[in-house]
Amino acid sequence: MKLLSAALLGAGLACSAANAETVLKLQTSTQSGAFEYTYVVDTWGPKLATMTGGEVKLEFTPINSIVDRGDTPEAVMGGVLQGDLTAVSYFTGRNPAFAILGDLIAGYDSVDQVQTFCRHGGGREILQELWDATLPGALHVVGCAAAAKEALVAKVPINGVADLEGVKIRSPSGLAATVFQKAGAAPVSMSLSDVFTSLEKGVIDAADASAYIN
């Protein structure tokens, strides 16, 4: 389960009152054909527009569509984007703590537990402190989201941990990659959009990628 995704806004935008017809452009961490992307575009975005009486509208874009997935914070700071809805595990290279908040392997049983931690257990505040330490005063954490349990697909039989030995597996960066490596696999970092062709061409043997619904 991808544990925490942060909706980030530039600090100035987050603190200002919304004007009529305010449109916020957000880049997501999912590709356009994924269920999660379709849901936020068709359901979540319109719901927010209705709740705000049309004052705030969200314009979502797929992963890597405007900037590289790892560069969204700077894009928000520079005004290219007004926010992002993305996996914070992408920022593990900036601070290892993002790996723990972003992809705590087997740490939660349900998305409700993730939301409870975020909203009532101090998770959002911890994530804000982490961003403040990384890019002081630049970004505001609006909230958290969680994806469902992800699929593990493979071209080779994997019936237990021992079968992971030597398997080239697409894995999120950070803690997930460390766990797979400790199990004997060879983690490979790549975008979800590259997973399908990489499996077909033998670039990877398996993939920890996306929710089952995709």
PLM feature spans:
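Short, polar/charged alpha-helical segment
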Residues: A34-E59, G174, T178-V179
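Short beta-strand-to-loop elements that line the ligand-binding cleft
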Residues: L58-V67, K168-S171, A185-S198
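Extracytoplasmic "Venus flytrap"
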Residues: K25-D42, I63-D68
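Contiguous mixed-secondary-structure segments that line small-molecule binding/active-site clefts
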Residues: D42-P46, A87-A186
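Pocket-lining segment of extracytoplasmic ligand-binding domains
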Residues: V88, L175-A177, A186-N214
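Bacterial N-terminal signal peptides
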Residues: S5-A14
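Sec/Tat signal peptide C-region and signal peptidase I cleavage site
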Residues: C15-A20
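Alpha-to-beta junction loops
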Residues: G53-V56, T72-T86, A185-P187, K201-A209
